[in-house]
């Protein structure tokens, strides 16, 4: 089963909109369906970015309850996933990301919005407990033949993010191509290179602007990212995947619409024709989905 975290060392990388737009293509690659769904968790408990992109999709059980080990997670109540006390409380979002109605329950969402007044992990929470709870969720999803767990994590070194990284077998490392993002990402990977074991880290330059007239050499910059990302993880058991910035790929291009409002481009294509920049981004979302599904489909 695929277990993937979308991660960025700094906020503002466009991590959540990247996840939001990759989801429908990942569902197609994995052949997700209502009996073998993808489970999506918004673990960015402060910003709640994905939860805000999915208004009116609060789940009956939220991410804080998941991390604290809600009783529903440990129950083996039903052989039917749709009747299980955990999965039955999750919000179907397939249609929200452009899938047909019959595949609405192929993607189930755990919101970060708290219904019972708990808005953060308190001082009595601890790393080991959170990690244990995520493992329990992972085992439950494996037992019920879920295709994947997809986790939107907070930036930096926050508890829920580190927990997700530890539990993942693939990590999408999202960065802008600015100097701050590059240096911060390299440093974080160096720090975590021996804490994280046997991970595939997919490096994704996101919202890449037009280089024309800037004096920067895009090829040289991408080669530098490849070299330094690989060096940051050398002597560890982790593997770097730089498919999205090699073989003529230039990361995921900047989408003009997303400067004003984030959205799902596949869903948007049902309303109007996509622009050139949007179509180019969709190609890269599809490529990322293929890289994520590789070995898991």
Residues of each region from the PLM?
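Walker A/P-loop phosphate-binding motif and the immediately C-terminal alpha-helix
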Residues: 2-47
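Conserved beta-strand segments of the P-loop GTPase G domain that flank and frequently precede/overlap
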Residues: 6, 41, 110-112, 150, ...
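Active-site signature of alpha/beta-hydrolase-fold catalytic machinery across serine-
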Residues: 21, 25, 52-53, 163
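P-loop/Walker-type NTP enzyme "switch/lid" segment
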Residues: 45-142
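Conserved nucleotide-binding/hydrolysis micro-motifs of P-loop NTPases
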Residues: 45-47, 114-117, 155-157, 178-180, ...
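P-loop/Walker A phosphate-binding loop and immediately adjacent motor/lid segment at beta-alpha junctions
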Residues: 121-138, 185-213
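Inter-motif core of Ras-like GTPase G domains
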Residues: 158-179
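C-terminal lobe/tail of nucleotide-utilizing enzymes
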Residues: 194, 198-297
